[in-house]
Amino acid sequence: MNPIIISMIGFTIILGTTIVLMSSHWFMIWIGFEMNMLAIIPVLMKSHHPRSTEASTKYFLTQTTASMLMLLSVMINLIYTGQWTAMKLANPTASTIMTLSLAMKLGLSPFHFWVPEVTQGIPLTSGLILLTWQKLAPLSVLYIASPNLNMTMLLTMSILSVVMGGWGGLNQTQLRKILAFSSIAHMGWMTAIIMFNPTLTLLNLLLYILMTTTIFMILIFTKSTTTLSISYMWNKTPIMTVIMLTILMSLGGLPPLSGFMPKWMIIQELTKNNNIALALIMAMSALLNLYFYMRLMYATTLTMFPSSNNIKMKWYYTNNLPTKYLPTLTIMSTLLLPLTPMMMMLLN
């Protein structure tokens, strides 16, 4: 692709998200979403493969439907209240439709089916953008409008997302699908706590982006897309394999790694607000995620026979990408748990 076109597309993606993040006017928020969506389509289709085309079409149809629902919600609210302000979503019907729209954009259950399919059909770099950067705009709108949204519906979808995110990843062998289901589960955790402590949602989002970015960087570095290719990584880059499996454990919320911090704080916040049943359901559902990560680790480390490197691997004779950012990201993705008391003090 032409470097000028790549620069224009990247600038439009960043500009669209920035407009959403900085706007309090519903029409400008909608325009930002549309700019971002139209610019991300060529990024998803850059491999010129039929699967990429199919994934891009699914993404386009889903996001277009969500944008239509958002515009419908804004119009209903405008008719009843005369307000364009994002913080004033007073009409119950508009509030319900807006909740559905944002859930569809984030990939919350039961609107989650597009996330694994789209992630599986696109290249790793596009998957990284889809599962990290593309979550910023809808979550920022959810953060702003959360006091006016249908919280019963949002909590129900959050619980379903945590359950389906763990359940859907159980029998997967494709790493992109595993990370997609992990994204669904993490979105469930973030939206569950947003009505009690919105700042905790931002902390969870930050750690999720850190861990997901680190894993995708390792997958891009080694060109690994399946669980079998991780097993072959032992012969080429054993240290990188250990790092990736450790970060997967962190993503699953295993103490004493960084990923345990947001789950600990969210469960503590839910119990503090007398939502013990909700905290129990989410904690039990998180075990599903941890199970398929541990199964992946077990299959990679303990079920492979010791072997010499007699297999010509895809990355063996290619120039490897530089990894100058990887040590910092790895440390932040695994060793932030001791900062939990300070985070609790800042967020309370």
Curated annotation (Swiss-Prot):
Keywords for the protein's UniProt record, in alphabetical order: Electron transport, Membrane, Mitochondrion, Mitochondrion inner membrane, NAD, Respiratory chain, Translocase, Transmembrane, Transmembrane helix, Transport, Ubiquinone
Superkingdom, taxonomy of origin: Eukaryota
GO cellular component, one term: mitochondrial inner membrane
Membrane-crossing segments per the record: 3-23, 25-45, 59-79, 93-115, 149-169, 178-198, 201-221, 239-259, 276-296, 326-346
InterPro entries: Complex_I_Subunit_2, NADH_DH_su2_C, NADH_UbQ_OxRdtase_chain2, ND/Mrp_TM
Catalytic reaction equation(s): a ubiquinone + NADH + 5 H(+)(in) = a ubiquinol + NAD(+) + 4 H(+)(out)
Molecular function in Gene Ontology: NADH dehydrogenase (ubiquinone) activity
EC number: 7.1.1.2
GO process annotations (BP): mitochondrial electron transport, NADH to ubiquinone; mitochondrial respiratory chain complex I assembly
Main EC class the enzyme belongs to: translocase
Keyword Electron transport attributed: yes
Subunit structure and binding partners: Core subunit of respiratory chain NADH dehydrogenase (Complex I) which is composed of 45 different subunits. Interacts with TMEM242.
UniProt family annotation: Belongs to the complex I subunit 2 family.
Protein name: NADH-ubiquinone oxidoreductase chain 2
Originating organism: Thyroptera tricolor (Spix's disk-winged bat)
The encoding gene: MT-ND2
